[in-house]
Amino acid sequence: TTEIYTLSLHDALPILSAKKENTMKTTTANPVTSEMSRSRTTFMVKLALMVAIIFVMAFSPLGYLRTPGLTITFLTVPVAVGAIILGPTAGAICGGAFGLTSAIMALTGGSAFSAALLQINPFGLLFTLLVPRILEGWLCGLIFAALKKVSKNGAFVIASLSCPLLNTLLFMSSLVLFFFHTEYIQNIASGLGTSNPLFFVVLFVGIQGAIEAVVCTILGSAVSRALTAALKK
C-alpha cells in the first residue's frame, strides 16, 4: 500500500506542477489582454465621440458659415483633431463621416450646388464628396505621425493646416475631373471669367479656402494639443 501511494504521489507531482505553471501563465497573460481590450474600447469611444461631433456640427449652424456668396465649412477641424490624437485610420473614418454628411445633404436637398451635381452624375458626386474627405483625414494623420518625431509643436500646426488644404485640393481635383466639362460648371467658370481648370479652382475657392485654412489651423492645433495633454493625465 505504501509503495502504491508513493508511486501515485510521484506520478501526480509533474501534473500538479504543470497545472501550477499554466495557472501562472494565465494569470500573467490576463492583465495584458485586459489592457489591450481596455485600450481598444477607449479608442472606439473617442472615435465615436469625434464622429458624433462631426454629425452634430454638420446639421447645425456650428458646421458651416453660410453667406449669400460663400459657404465656409468648419468640419475639417474635428477631422484634423481626430486624425492627430487618434491616428491615420481614425482620421480616415472622421473624414468619411464628414463626406457622409455632405452626401446626406446632397440627397436631401440641403446643398443646392451638390443637388445640381447629383442630377448630372450621381457616382461622380458621391466620389467627390466621400473619397477626398477620407484621404484628407488619413493623410493628415500620417503627416502628424511623421512630423511629431521632428517637432511635436510644429506637427500640430502643420497637420491642422494640411487638413483644409487637402480637403480643398482633393475635392476640387475630383470636381474638375468629373464635372468641369459639364454645362453647369462651365456656366460657373464663365461667370468667373475663365475657361482654364486651374484658374477656375483658384477663383472658385478664393477667400473661402483661405478662411477655412486659417480657422482649422488655429482651432485644430489648439484643440488637439490640449486634448493630447489632457489624455496623458
Q: Where does each model-flagged region fall?
A:
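Short, small-residue-biased leader/transition segments that mark boundaries at the very start
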Residues: T1-L13
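Loop-helix junctions at membrane interfaces
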Residues: S17-K233
